[in-house]
């Protein structure tokens, strides 16, 4: 009897985490200049992340030169993998050679499309490149929750070493980091993130759309903070109320809220 050969490959359904870039103009010169201004000096920002281009916010008569946008993103170390478009946009959008993709982020709630777009779709994965304004809370919150084993939910990941530039950690539950998260390092979790040291890199919590996820740290100095795809970068200085201090970050009405923590 001949032995059955093991298959050399398999094809199955799956999902891939990706950033979602939503241009609001088809003026490629202006768009390229703005992307370069924001990210050229921080090449580790994208760090070879895959990115989908969402053209649904463009006006009906606008045609974005997607090939030029792909070139700009490649120069910034982002890898474009496809285009998200409305049925009316599909014809011209796919003419640039990228596949059409489905997006499973939350849709605007109705009303004026432009106003709803400004409120931001909450995208999946590591979030769309749109800045959410940080709301300052007037009152301090209680001390950072304990990270002892009894308090942890199943699937919590603990990292007890410093994370250097270029290192990335992904947790399918909560993530606890007991040492420094350096500039250029990235911590990602489907649940909450706790950093018991300086947070200087990127922290992305609730990356599968968990709007209740939070980020806690004992020294807030990040390059980027994101919850459920809504994020803010350190390009604008962090307010003194929580900069380089213990803080937590949460979502309220699709807006990032930063609150100082009382450490006792």
From Swiss-Prot:
Biased composition (Low complexity): 124-147
Region Disordered, annotated ranges: 103-147
SUPFAM superfamilies for this protein: Cell-division inhibitor MinC, C-terminal domain (SSF63848)
Compositional bias (Basic and acidic residues): 110-122
Record carries keyword Cell cycle: yes
Bilayer-crossing regions: none
Keywords assigned by UniProt, alphabetized: Cell cycle, Cell division, Septation
Pfam family, one: MinC_N
Highest taxon of the lineage: Bacteria
InterPro entries on file: CAP/MinC_C (IPR016098), MinC (IPR013033), MinC_C_sf (IPR036145), MinC_N (IPR007874), Septum_form_inhib_MinC_C (IPR005526)
GO biological process, one term: regulation of cell septum assembly
Subunit composition and interactions: Interacts with MinD and FtsZ.
Entry function: Cell division inhibitor that blocks the formation of polar Z ring septums. Rapidly oscillates between the poles of the cell to destabilize FtsZ filaments that have formed before they mature into polar Z rings. Prevents FtsZ polymerization.
Similarity annotation: Belongs to the MinC family.
PANTHER family in the record: SEPTUM SITE-DETERMINING PROTEIN MINC
Protein name: Probable septum site-determining protein MinC
Gene source species: Ralstonia pickettii (strain 12J)
């Amino acid at each position: 009897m001949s032995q059955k050969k093991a298959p050399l490959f398999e094809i199955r359904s799956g999902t891939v985490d990706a950033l979602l870039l939503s241009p609001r103009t088809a003026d490629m010169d202006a768009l390229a200049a703005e992307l370069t201004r924001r990210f050229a000096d921080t090449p580790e920002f994208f760090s070879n992340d895959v990115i989908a281009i969402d053209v649904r916010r463009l006006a009906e008569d606008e045609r974005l030169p997607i090939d030029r946008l792909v070139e700009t993103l490649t120069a910034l170390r982002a890898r474009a993998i496809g285009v998200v478009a409305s049925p009316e946009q599909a014809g011209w959008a796919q003419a640039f050679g990228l596949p059409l993709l489905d997006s499973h982020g939350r849709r605007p709630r109705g009303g004026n499309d432009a106003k709803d777009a400004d409120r931001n779709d909450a995208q999946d994965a590591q979030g769309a490149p749109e800045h959410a304004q940080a709301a300052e809370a007037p009152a301090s919150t209680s001390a950072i929750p304990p990270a002892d084993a009894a308090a942890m939910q199943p699937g919590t990941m603990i990292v007890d070493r410093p994370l250097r530039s270029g290192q990335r950690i992904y947790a399918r539950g909560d993530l606890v980091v007991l040492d420094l998260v350096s500039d250029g390092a990235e911590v990602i979790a489907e649940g909450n993130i706790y950093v018991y040291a300086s947070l200087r890199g990127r922290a992305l919590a609730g990356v599968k759309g968990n709007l209740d996820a939070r980020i806690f740290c004992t020294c807030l100095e990040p390059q980027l903070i994101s919850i459920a795809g809504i994020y803010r970068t350190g390009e604008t200085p962090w307010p003194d109320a929580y900069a380089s201090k213990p803080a937590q970050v949460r979502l309220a009405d699709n807006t990032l809220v930063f609150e100082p923590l009382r450490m006792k």
